[in-house]
């Protein structure tokens, strides 16, 4: 069921904003960040598990309430090359181009949980 919901979100956002050629290949992963946990600046675009396919869209769904941890802010670099902080309210979801650099700042207290996912397709031309 989670896979179907995530797939629908990807397809709806793609149709409205990106119009990428996506294949029926979607990956999802539950990530937990404990105190000190973080993820440095990176891009998700690149080889996907299926040969000849790349990650085109990325998604992050915020699962715990912000009061359950401190730190752990998700930041993205926008197209003007400025960092923006993503809303970390319970259930907040963001879908973005996998070529956009992003990071998660270190957790200073508690545990941050996120569902992340990727929509894949042929390499961009």
Task: Label the predicted regions.
Residues 1-93, 99-125:
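Fe(II)/2-oxoglutarate oxygenase catalytic core
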């Amino acid at each position: 069921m989670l896979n179907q919901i995530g797939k629908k979100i990807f397809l709806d956002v793609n149709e409205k904003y990106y119009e990428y050629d996506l294949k029926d290949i979607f990956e999802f992963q539950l990530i937990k960040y404990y105190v000190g946990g973080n993820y440095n600046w990176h891009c998700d675009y690149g080889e996907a598990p299926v040969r000849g396919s790349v990650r085109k869209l990325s998604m992050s769904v915020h699962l715990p309430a912000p009061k359950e941890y401190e730190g752990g802010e998700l930041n993205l670099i926008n197209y003007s090359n400025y960092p923006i902080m993503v809303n970390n309210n319970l259930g907040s979801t963001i879908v973005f181009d996998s070529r956009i650099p992003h990071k998660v700042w270190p957790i200073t207290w508690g545990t941050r949980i996120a569902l992340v996912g990727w929509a894949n397709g042929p390499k961009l031309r």
